[in-house]
Structure formats: structure tokens, C-alpha cells
């Protein structure tokens, strides 16, 4: 039992820590089946093992492009361990008190303290997923530094208490590989180890995932979508299975919209592709070349003069 925690919850959803009553968050009850890529699930579960009384679990970071299934992977691992799951969605404006304990004005006019999903998992021995952790600022990360090392505690300045993690508490952080993120401080990255990279599923797994989410989708549309996604993966384009699900969903809704004047499947699918991913997605090879050129152009910029002069211009100040 964590230090300062007075027995079992004093009432449904509440615990007391050093005389302060905390309202606990609700566990996530979403279905969490994991399809394919069993090795990375085994790797995550290994991170959470404890092999000796003096050993501590690891808090890994799970990386990958948006929509590839990082959060679902963590959910499946929590389910495999038969532990309650709590998910905290990190954002650019997440504050330390959002991560830990938030004061709320109760109906009585008094201040009530609400534990975050993270703190609830800490106190109850659950699993917490810090989702999209690299969207969070350094000030918020700093409040978690002692939790992510051998101390396994956090300090709530708002409530004036120290919170110690239960021995069964487990944590991981998902991180998107895109440009719209913060750089996580090195002293935090050194605590979020190891790195588990989740890549795209293979053709069979991708088909199984789409069938799982859309069991009513016709086989020809499923095959068309999987073929598109596999081609995109081969060209290093970051279209994910989530995109495939959305393409199929919209196409199926368009097909069912007007039974008196049915749209052809190909027409509905092509329209859906454009509406979900844009017109450029109709020609993946051209899109891949454009993006490769854009990345190459970014890498070739050396100074301010590159914005105003061509590379071979004799007036270029850096030539």
C-alpha cells in the first residue's frame, strides 16, 4: 500500500492521502484487442516485469507515425496484465496540476481535489498511458521526473502532499513522429527507456485490422484499401490503418445513402480517398517524389541567402 494512503478508498472513487481526500479518475473501459506484431507486445510486457524485490519496472516510450496503433498496443498490454488502464492525453497546454491533482470548487463551496488518470493509476496500482507525450511542455515533464526514476513519487503543490506509486503501477509514453511536437528534455528521455518503435503492419495484419473494425465491409473494398495502404508504406508515406478505416467508413456511408440511385463502389471509394486524404493521394508515386524533394530542399538550406538566391546565382552571398 502506498505511503500515506489510509486503507481502502473511504468511499466509491475517493482515497485519502495524508488527510487530503482525492477524487479518483475512472478507468478506461474500451475494448483493446491487439492484432498482429506480437513481438512488440512482448517487448512492452517485458519492460513492465519485475525480476527481483529490488528491481523496478521500466517506463518505455512507444514511437511511430500517427494512427499506427501505439495507444492500442499499450491498452492490450494492460489487458494482458489484467490491470486497470488510465489514459492521459498530453497537449501543448498541459499544466503540472493537470498531470497530478486539480482543485475544483465543489457544490458546498469548498475546494475538492481531483486526481488525474496518472495519479489514480499510481495510487491504485493501474497502468497509465501518457498519450502523445512529446506534445507536452518541459514544465509539465519536470513534475514527473521523480516518478520516472527510482523514487517513484510526485509532489502535488496544489494539494500539499507527496504521492507514492503503488508497486504494481506501470507507465508508458506514446510519441508521434511528426513535426508538431515539443522536444522532450534529455533528462526525461533518459528515464523513458527503452524505445519501442511500432511500424506499419504487413498486408495480412492490415486486412485483419480493417475486418476487425469494419466486419460489414465488402471484400473488394477491403482489398482496395489494403492495396492502397501497402503501396503507401512502400513509398514511405505516412498513411496509416486509421486512414484506411476512415476511407472505408465514408465510402460505405456514401454507398448506403441513396438506394434508389446507387453509386458504384469504385466511385465511392475514390471520392472517399480524396475527402479523407486529399487529391494528392490519388497518385502516390508523384506524392512521394514531391515530399522527397521538399525534404531535400530543406536539407540544402545553409543560410539566409538561400531564401533569396538560386544556388548557382553569382550574387549569392554564400557562394
Q: What would you call each of these model-derived segments?
A:
Residues 1-220, 317-319:
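AAA+ P-loop NTPase catalytic core and its hallmark functional loops
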Residues 42-51, 246-250, 274-275:
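Short, hydrophobic/amphipathic alpha-helical patches that form generic packing surfaces
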Residues 52, 218, 252-256, 277-282:
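Short alpha-helix boundary/capping elements
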Residues 78, 262-319:
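C-terminal engagement/docking regions of AAA+ P-loop ATPases
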Residues 117, 143, 205, 220-224, ...:
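Exposed alpha-helical structural elements
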Residues 149-152, 195, 229-238, 296-309:
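Short flexible/disordered coil segments
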Residues 153, 201, 257-260, 282, ...:
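Charged, solvent-exposed alpha-helical segments that act as regulatory interaction surfaces
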Residues 214-271:
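Conserved AAA+ ATPase small/helical "lid" subdomain
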Amino acid at each position: 500500500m502506498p505511503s500515506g494512503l489510509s486503507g481502502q478508498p473511504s468511499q466509491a472513487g475517493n482515497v485519502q492521502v495524508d488527510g487530503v481526500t482525492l477524487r479518483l479518475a475512472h478507468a478506461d473501459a474500451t475494448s483493446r484487442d491487439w492484432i498482429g506484431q506480437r513481438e512488440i507486445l512482448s517487448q512492452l510486457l517485458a519492460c513492465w516485469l519485475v525480476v527481483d524485490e529490488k528491481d523496478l519496472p521500466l517506463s518505455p516510450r512507444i514511437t511511430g507515425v500517427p494512427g499506427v496503433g501505439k495507444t492500442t498496443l499499450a491498452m492490450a498490454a494492460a489487458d494482458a496484465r489484467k490491470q486497470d488502464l488510465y489514459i492521459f492525453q498530453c497537449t501543448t497546454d498541459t499544466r503540472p496540476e493537470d498531470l497530478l491533482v486539480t482543485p475544483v470548487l465543489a457544490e458546498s463551496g469548498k475546494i475538492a481535489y481531483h486526481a488525474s488518470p496518472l495519479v489514480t493509476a499510481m495510487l491504485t496500482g493501474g497502468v497509465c498511458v501518457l498519450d502523445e507525450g512529446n506534445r507536452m511542455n518541459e514544465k509539465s515533464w519536470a513534475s514527473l521526473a521523480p516518478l520516472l526514476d527510482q523514487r517513484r513519487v510526485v509532489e502535488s503543490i496544489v494539494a500539499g502532499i507527496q504521492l507514492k506509486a503503488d508497486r504494481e503501477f506501470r507507465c508508458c509514453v506514446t510519441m508521434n513522429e511528426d513535426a508538431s511536437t515539443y522536444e522532450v528534455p534529455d533528462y526525461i528521455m533518459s528515464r523513458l527507456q527503452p524505445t519501442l518503435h511500432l511500424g506499419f503492419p504487413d498486408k495480412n495484419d492490415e486486412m485483419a485490422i480493417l475486418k476487425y473494425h469494419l466486419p460489414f465491409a465488402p471484400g473488394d473494398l477491403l482489398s482496395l484499401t489494403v492495396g492502397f495502404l501497402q503501396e503507401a508504406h512502400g513509398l514511405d508515406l505516412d498513411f496509416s490503418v486509421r486512414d484506411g478505416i476512415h476511407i472505408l467508413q465514408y465510402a460505405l456511408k456514401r454507398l448506403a445513402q441513396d438506394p434508389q440511385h446507387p453509386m458504384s463502389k469504385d466511385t465511392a471509394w475514390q471520392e472517399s480517398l480524396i475527402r479523407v486524404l486529399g487529391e494528392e493521394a490519388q497518385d502516390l508515386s508523384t506524392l512521394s517524389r514531391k515530399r522527397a524533394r521538399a525534404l531535400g530542399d530543406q536539407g540544402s538550406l545553409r543560410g539566409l541567402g538561400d531564401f533569396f538566391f538560386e544556388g548557382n546565382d553569382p550574387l549569392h552571398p554564400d557562394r
